[in-house]
Amino acid sequence: MRKYTHYHIPVMVREVIEYLKPEDEKIILDCTVGEGGHARAILEHCPGCKLIGIDVDSEVLQIAEKKLKDFSDRVSLFKASYRDADFLLKTLEIEKVDGILLDLGVSTYQLKGENRGFTFEREEPLDMRMDLESEITAQKVLNELSEEELARIIFEYGEEKRYARRIARKIVENRPLNTTLDLVKAVSEALPSHEIRRRKRHFATRTFQAIRIYVNRELENLREFLLNKAEKLLRVGGRIVVISFHSLEDRIVKEAFRNSRKLRILTEKPVRPSEEEVRENPRSRSARLRAAELVEEGGD
């Protein structure tokens, strides 16, 4: 594993515990355990509960294992996609859990660690895979997909409404793209200078988000889990808490909760981080938390 000197600060920890309500003898499924920040807080808060943590990123799991070593008798970590959580629990002979947590988005390690390709701040290979065993990389997507398909991805997943086609055209013109700075260059050539100056965030943020979402099938996985898996994994009275970081994710969560006959929504509007937390951890600014409780058996 690469040398790592950056530490991930979990967002909205107090709110996660408030809505998840971990209790002794209960089992919590942390579907995106990452570096173990939320998991540690849950285990510290509830000395008698157990936690199953899963993540597709084998490197962050190594960090989580070290962070959670004091709770080794109450925590089990696995490399897996939360989309396949039902199969994992079946192999563990666990029928239901009492709480589910999803903290979506990219971890600090993925952003700050070397050669992962998630950042536009320095030159790295165009990777962007959360699961390093996956065959689809950002480089493959950017160099092999058609201009039309790239424009669709940037429009839909990056919410780049006005300039998606121009960006896709510049990507194709600049091929082959091999590094993150190659992609930044293509985006900068596509956007008018006044648009670059106008944007509050880095001008390539939306395009990087779009390619990352596509590479990792983030929205498909979230939709599949919420619509077809989550309710079946929860006991009646169990709770699901989801933290999202952009409107595409939040929309899926909101609609899944509202369209379910078996969930009672606990957060009519998304809960946002406190002003104090945003000051201490600017990354939390865009976080939205939604929670629901299973009130009717979710099936086998």
Swiss-Prot record:
Subcellular location: Cytoplasm
InterPro entries with a match to the protein in the record: RsmH, SAM-dep_MeTrfase_MraW_recog, SAM-dependent_MTases_sf
Keyword Translocase tagged: no
Top-level enzyme category: transferase
Ligand binding (S-adenosyl-L-methionine): 36-38, 55, 89, 103, 110
EC number: 2.1.1.199
Catalytic activity from the UniProt record: cytidine(1402) in 16S rRNA + S-adenosyl-L-methionine = N(4)-methylcytidine(1402) in 16S rRNA + S-adenosyl-L-homocysteine + H(+)
UniProt superkingdom: Bacteria
Keywords tagged on the record: Cytoplasm, Methyltransferase, rRNA processing, S-adenosyl-L-methionine, Transferase
Pfam families: Methyltransf_5
Main localization (coarse): cytoplasm
GO cellular component, one term: cytoplasm
Classification via CDD domains: AdoMet_MTases
NCBIfam families linked: 16S rRNA (cytosine(1402)-N(4))-methyltransferase RsmH
Function noted in UniProt: Specifically methylates the N4 position of cytidine in position 1402 (C1402) of 16S rRNA.
UniProt family annotation: Belongs to the methyltransferase superfamily. RsmH family.
Stated name of the protein: Ribosomal RNA small subunit methyltransferase H
Organism: Thermotoga neapolitana (strain ATCC 49049 / DSM 4359 / NBRC 107923 / NS-E)
